[in-house]
């Protein structure tokens, strides 16, 4: 069989076309040192800041220090078996976590892996933990409320959808309790919740999850956990992972609420990583970029306009705005709000709820100090009825505090001052609320109306709590439709005012408290 030159060249071309070589270009490096969860790698020339580096044993590290002759990376997970000379590879990917509705009702770790024993996650894809916050043009002003269910917060320090409201106070002052009750109160509001637990005991987190389940709020919540026993890297990254999960709902025209419990521990974890990476320390040994650590996280909580949502969903969702509301928690030492991290976060957020240990120990719970607690944008989001009825509460408390301090030195007080002191004491008593007992807008409005219009004047101070409970039970039993109407509309007019007067007059006549 003879082949001419044309056939030979055709056969060679066919063979070349059929020849299939799979080649992957890996930027490979060598570990030169391992200590305290930090590895130094030589040879990763093309690595990006924040890139995942693949380690032996299906583990990853994140590149944080890019130096001339080596890369400093923090290991996510156990590192005891890593040694000098081991080979590592670039992945070309930034850290991503699973996102989607399938995560609701689940407990996951920083990397999005389930840790609740309920099987694999049903997710809608992955999202990078680090994302650029929406720009100025893509945002919309805050004008819808997030009801926490607490009278003192919803009346005096209202929170709006898309707001960042700091919860700050010493340890054991009820910060987590306030945040958990805010989640429980969203059961029927349509707001999806994310609870990020940073550096807490596993037993504490277990109690929180159980309480959410008992009150029917877990099915609406994603719990992201980085316990105290986990590495500093996972504690530092947990808030960003939770934020990415919350942004999934915001970008699709829905409302979400995220709790960071707490950012003080995240800052400590980041300080540990930075010092081990030999970055220069600053005030209180924190690195220079600790402000940026929190600002880039909290700026992602926002209210985005309908154009942003439509562009993101490629026209699938039209005419809907989305929001991510953040409630970061900061723990202070002996009430010192002028420390480095507290002042940073106060300057980033749109207001703060300050909880005081003195008030907490005096039995005033939630222990909100109305003097230095403020909401800078929430007032625009308050419902009409709450705005109308809550105006006098803050003033009454401020006057009461001033007079109470003055009255300690005065032996005889005139009737007007006595009356004001009595009113202030009763309002303070009225704002007390038990844990896991959030109140609806209508219930809060009725109670505030009673305080505002002087219905508590002839009620003994010790009977204020039982008066409130009996009033709400009576209103719910006899005027349930009116309360439902107020919850749905939030409106306030002469007709509702007249009905409230009628309810209180009839109830006071019964003397059943």
From Swiss-Prot:
InterPro entries: ATP_synth_asu-like_sf, ATP_synth_asu_C, ATP_synth_asu_C_sf, ATP_synth_F1_a_nt-bd_dom, ATP_synth_F1_asu, ATPase_a/bsu_AS, ATPase_F1/V1/A1_a/bsu_N, ATPase_F1/V1/A1_a/bsu_N_sf
Keyword Ligase: no
EC number(s) from the headed UniProt entry: 7.1.2.2
Required for activity, annotated site positions: 373
Disulfide pairings: none
Keyword Transcription in annotation: no
Pfam short name (any one): ATP-synt_ab_C
Compartments, as annotated in UniProt: Cell inner membrane
Record-stated family: Belongs to the ATPase alpha/beta chains family.
Subunit structure: F-type ATPases have 2 components, CF(1) - the catalytic core - and CF(0) - the membrane proton channel. CF(1) has five subunits: alpha(3), beta(3), gamma(1), delta(1), epsilon(1). CF(0) has three main subunits: a(1), b(2) and c(9-12). The alpha and beta chains form an alternating ring which encloses part of the gamma chain. CF(1) is attached to CF(0) by a central stalk formed by the gamma and epsilon chains, while a peripheral stalk is formed by the delta and b chains.
Protein name: ATP synthase subunit alpha
Organism: Pectobacterium carotovorum subsp. carotovorum (strain PC1)
Lineage: Bacteria, Pseudomonadati, Pseudomonadota, Gammaproteobacteria, Enterobacterales
